[in-house]
UniProtKB/Swiss-Prot annotation:
This is N(2)-fixation sustaining protein CowN. One of its GO terms (biological process) is nitrogen fixation. It comes from Rhodopseudomonas palustris (strain BisA53). InterPro entries: CowN (IPR024899). The gene is cowN. It holds the Pfam family CowN.
């Protein structure tokens, strides 16, 4: 009998789901503002990756980490950038 694999076992007590959700909530502000074409693309890819490939938001954020970091820096959104960096250090 094979045990189910949990790739997030090392994140126990790291609240990766909560941290991912809070970062996504902050990013939604940028998506709604639609000041950069990337945000519409990112929102579409998030939906596709979540629904079609079964990837969670932590994986979606990881896939776009360099681009997100650059855009958040350019926008001066230090709060979301700090949240994203914390997520990267503790959970990626």
């Amino acid at each position: 009998m094979t045990a189910a694999f949990d790739r997030y076992v090392s994140f126990k007590n790291a609240d990766w789901e909560g941290k991912s959700q809070r970062v996504m909530e902050r990013l939604q502000i940028h998506i709604d503002a639609a000041q950069n074409p990337f945000w519409a693309y990112f929102a579409q890819k998030r939906t596709e990756l979540n629904q079609k490939q079964g990837l969670d938001d932590l994986r979606v954020l990881h896939n776009y980490l360099p681009t997100l970091r650059e855009i958040l820096e350019d926008n001066g959104d230090q709060e979301t950038l700090a949240m994203l960096e914390d997520l990267e250090v503790t959970c990626m």
